[in-house]
A protein has these predicted regions:
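Mid-to-C-terminal Rossmann-like scaffold of FAD/NAD(P)H-dependent oxidoreductases
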Residues: 1, 283-399
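Beta1-alpha1 glycine-rich phosphate/pyrophosphate-binding loop at the start
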Residues: 1-73, 116, 165-188, 400
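Short hydrophobic core segments
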Residues: 6, 80, 102-112, 155, ...
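A Rossmann-like FAD-binding core segment of flavoenzymes
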Residues: 25-27, 69, 75-96, 101-102, ...
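Rossmann-like dinucleotide-binding cores of NAD(P)H-dependent redox enzymes
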Residues: 59, 151-152, 159-217, 297-303, ...
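Glycine-rich dinucleotide-binding loop and its adjacent helix/turn
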Residues: 109-171, 206, 260, 266-268
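FAD-site-proximal beta/loop scaffold in flavoenzymes
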Residues: 124-148, 224-226, 231-312, 404
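Residue-level detector of conserved catalytic or cofactor/ligand-binding positions
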Residues: 399-407
Length: 408
């Protein structure tokens, strides 16, 4: 048996390791168009900010160590540019432009997602970055050092955007955050995001909500960011953290079915519409366990779980069904901890689902004990059955209840 895996970060690397554990004899080939595999995406902002001092700590495995440990043929800087399902072959392009073909018995797609980069005037100017991989991290780190950056604009206030805002701030950079929506951190409700807004402002971050960027202009003095309101923000660098989209180009080329939400369609066994081709990670869509509606979930833990399940299905046949994930996440925003799981009230309202919510304002521990910190928890649930739909928590550094919410 010959297995080919396309994409070597979260789901792909996990699947390769699991394949070797359950199948000691077959050939496993792992293709990655970048230079690195199996790295810690969530740690990238903290390396840029100097919290993580050693770059090597981001790399869970190198291509060489992974290949030797699991007896996997790891081919970095080898981009799969075409899949031919009828012939069970792929076309690969190397870094020097050479093309070749490989056959497979079963294939796994784990291409991840690509950053949203709208076609705005000036967006390709020097000093405007996205952050998605180790190469992006190196470019940003070098630019910060070589250009003595003093002012930065972060466009987008999701997890990566706010983590970058914090780390740039800690590095002595004056930070402005521009967000098109009326709040930061879209998975949580506005009422839970409001204290985060106050905290960011207290820390010295300039926050522009319900603002969109119209264009950028590069001058000798730096970059000017033009907003829809007519305001301008001067900057030495810009980080685009607008969001990501499933990387589906290869799947579309192969004629695989794309779902309603824009991700690669898979069945309960994570097999695509083509026999013997499976898919995992940020590129797939899957029914939400609470609603049955197709959705996209850009988180590492579900991708890793999918990787383990799909490896078993590729070896033993489609026997293990993936139960789905509800989008559990946790993030640090300066001194605050923000956690959420399941469906927020605004999402339930959007999907016209009957619900009630409960908000509790408490403390991280008993008030009579020193250093108690404010803690807010919000639950969403069905008003009749009491079925829990979701939970959100905001607290302060050192508060473990938000962490426990995340693990629940």
């Amino acid at each position: 048996m010959k297995y080919i895996i396309i994409g070597g970060v979260a789901g792909g690397a996990t699947a390769a390791a699991r394949l070797r554990r359950v199948d000691e004899k077959s050939d496993i080939l792992l293709f990655e168009k970048g230079k690195y595999i199996s790295y810690a995406n969530c740690g990238l902002p903290y390396y840029i900010g100097g919290v993580i001092a050693e770059r090597e700590k981001l790399l869970v495995q190198t291509p060489t160590s992974f290949g030797q440990r699991f007896r996997v043929d790891v081919r970095v800087e080898n981009e799969v540019i075409a899949i031919h399902p009828k012939d069970k072959t792929i076309t690969v392009r190397t870094a020097d432009g050479r093309e070749y073909e490989e056959t497979y018995d079963k294939l796994l797609l784990s291409p991840g997602a690509t950053p949203v980069r709208p076609p705005l005037e000036g967006i390709d100017s020097e000093g405007i970055f996205t952050l998605r991989n180790v190469e992006d991290t190196d470019h940003i780190k070098s630019y910060l050092t070589e250009n003595s950056v003093k002012r930065a604009v972060v466009v987008g206030a999701g997890f990566i955007g706010l983590e970058m805002a914090e780390n740039l701030h800690h590095a002595g950079v004056a930070v402005s955050v521009v967000e098109m929506g009326n709040q930061v951190m879209a998975p949580i409700d506005f009422s839970m995001a409001a204290p985060v807004h106050q905290h960011l402002i207290q820390k010295g971050v300039s926050l522009y909500l319900e603002e969109g960027v119209t264009h950028f202009q590069r001058t000798e003095q730096g970059i000017t960011v033009f907003l829809k309101s007519g305001k301008t923000i001067p900057a030495d660098m810009v980080l685009l953290s607008i969001g990501v989209r499933p990387a589906t180009a290869l799947a579309k080329q192969a004629g695989l079915k794309i779902g309603e939400a824009g991700g690669i369609w898979v069945n309960e066994y994570l097999e695509t519409s083509a026999k013997d081709i499976y898919a995992v990670g940020d590129a797939i869509e899957y029914p939400h366990p609470l609603t049955g509606k197709p959705w996209l979930n850009y988180l590492a833990n579900p991708a890793n779980r999918q990787g383990r399940i799909v490896a078993d299905n590729m070896v033993f046949g489609n026997k293990v069904a993936y139960e789905g994930a509800i989008g559990t996440s946790i993030a640090k925003v300066f001194d605050m901890t923000v956690a959420s799981t399941g469906l927020a009230a605004k999402r339930l309202k959007q999907w016209e689902m009957e619900y009630q919510s409960s908000v509790t304002h408490s403390s991280s521990h008993a008030g009579y004990y020193p250093d108690a910190l404010p803690l807010t928890l919000k639950l969403t649930f069905h008003p009749v059955t009491g079925k829990l739909y979701g939970a959100q928590g905001i607290g302060y550094e050192g508060d473990r209840k938000s962490t426990r919410l995340n693990s629940s």
